[in-house]
Each structure stands twice: as C-alpha cells, then as structure tokens.
C-alpha cells in the first residue's frame, strides 16, 4: 500500500505527547487555535465553505426549530450510515499508527463514535419510531457515498496525518455549529432539536474535538509546504463534502 509523502515525513511525530495548554488565538467551536498553526491554516483555507454551514437552510431550520421533521429524519438515517464509515476511517489509524498511545487514541475515537455519538442518533430514532434494521434497508445517497469513499481512500493511501485531516472537518464543523446554535436564545431548549444542539455544544464533544485539533497540529509538525498542501487538499475537500451533506439532507437527495 502506497504511503503519501506527508506520512513519510510526519511519521516521526506519531508519538502522542502530553497535552499542553494552548495559547490564545482564533476561536471556532470553542476551540483555541495557536497562531500560525497547521489547523489555523487549514481553517483559513476552508473558511468560505464553513461560512456556508451556518447560513444553510437546514442548519438554520435546526436553529429556529422550523426544519421539517421529514428532512431531519432523512438526515438522521443518512448520518447514521455515514458514522459507520467515519468510524472505519479512525480504525485505519489503529493500523497505521506505530506508537501505542496513538493507536489507543484512534481506538478510543472508534468507541466514542459507535458508543457515544450514535447514542444521540438512536435516541432520535426511537422518538421517530425507526429501528436499526430499517436504517440498514436505506440506500446511502450518492453524496453520502462519495464523501465516505473519499475519506476511506485517503485513509487507505495515507498515514495518521492524512487520516486526521480527512476526519477533522466533520468533527470540527459540528463543534462550531453546536456552539453557535447553543448561543442563540432558546435554541438549545427546543423540544425536538434542542437535544441535537446540546449534544454537539456539550463539553464532552467539544473536548473530543479539541483533542483532534491538537493531534492534527502534532502530526503535521515539521511538514514541508508540499506536504502541508496535501493535508489542506484533503481538509478542504472534506469541508466541501460536509456542505454537500447538508444540501443532500435539505433536498432529500435520492
């Protein structure tokens, strides 16, 4: 299996170091970024796309409670299927990592998705009368398939740095959306959508995302400009896929 140049250069950074207190910088989703960090550069490269998340009618509908339940149901089913492949991308990290602590980090995230984030989905599925068997009878939308196949291909061809670059736009953008929506008076108290907002704005989710942001900076430390460009390419592409996912749910894409 071919390893990308970014992995070959950055593999020396696979050892997981103790978390350090991060210096003040730009804020997004509650995360503090170090000035001139890799993640700050990745965010700047994708900022026009990210602005589209918060202005998208699907996200606005969650914020003000006006989103049709039919659209949310479609999103819920597609996102539940997506999360299995999302967990598989993390699982590639267990295989690619050479440091035991990094292996544990990737493994812990697989558990967090399957046992943690999916709990929110299952709670909504119960409210909507959806069984897991019904979920697996649903065909993934083309936008969903394209997104997950791209992430999995990046994970298969690359190393830990590429894997986190592929994963991060999802985790980070949900942290941002959750934080922004929770700041809207009354949004987190909505009888139906409030639970969704609270889950992504919550401390546990935010801490998990912060750890992934820090890991991205650690794995990419010392990369050349060419190697950084590959990480940027992956992150921006996945950011575009994220925006497409919201549009897929809004239009009930078949």
Where are these regions (language model features)?
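Long amphipathic all-alpha helical oligomerization modules
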Residues: 202-235
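Short, Lys/Arg-enriched N-terminal segments with co-localized hydrophobic residues
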Residues: 15, 21-32
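Active-site-proximal alpha-helical scaffolds that flank and shape metal-associated catalytic sites
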Residues: 101-207, 236, 240
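Short alpha-helical hairpin
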Residues: 43-67, 86, 213-222
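Alpha-helical bundle segments that constitute or directly flank the non-heme di-iron/ferroxidase center
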Residues: 47-52, 66-96, 116, 165-175, ...
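Acidic, carboxylate-rich catalytic segments that either coordinate divalent cations
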Residues: 230-254
């Amino acid at each position: 299996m071919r390893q990308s140049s970014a992995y070959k250069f950055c593999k020396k950074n696979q050892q997981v170091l103790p978390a350090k207190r991060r210096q003040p910088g730009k804020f997004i989703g509650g995360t503090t970024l170090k000035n001139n960090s890799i993640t700050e550069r990745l965010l700047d490269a994708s900022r026009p796309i990210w602005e589209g998340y918060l202005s998208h009618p699907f996200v606005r509908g969650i914020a003000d409670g006006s989103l049709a339940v039919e659209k949310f149901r479609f999103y819920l089913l597609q996102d539940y299927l997506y999360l299995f492949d999302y967990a598989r991308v993390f699982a590639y990290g267990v295989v690619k990592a050479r440091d035991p602590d990094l292996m544990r980090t990737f493994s812990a995230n697989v558990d967090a998705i399957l046992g943690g984030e999916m709990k929110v989905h299952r709670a909504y599925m119960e409210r909507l009368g959806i069984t897991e068997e019904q979920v697996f009878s649903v065909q993934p939308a083309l936008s969903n398939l394209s997104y997950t196949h791209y992430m999995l291909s990046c994970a298969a061809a690359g190393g830990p740095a590429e894997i986190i670059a592929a994963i991060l736009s999802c985790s980070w953008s949900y942290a941002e959306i959750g934080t922004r929506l929770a700041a809207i008076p009354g949004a987190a108290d909505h009888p139906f959508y409030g639970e969704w907002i609270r889950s992504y704005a919550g401390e546990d989710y935010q801490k998990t995302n912060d750890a992934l942001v820090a890991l991205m900076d650690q794995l990419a430390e010392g990369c050349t400009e060419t190697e950084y460009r590959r990480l940027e390419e992956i992150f921006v592409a996945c950011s575009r896929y994220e925006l497409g996912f919201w549009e897929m749910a809004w239009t009930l894409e078949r």
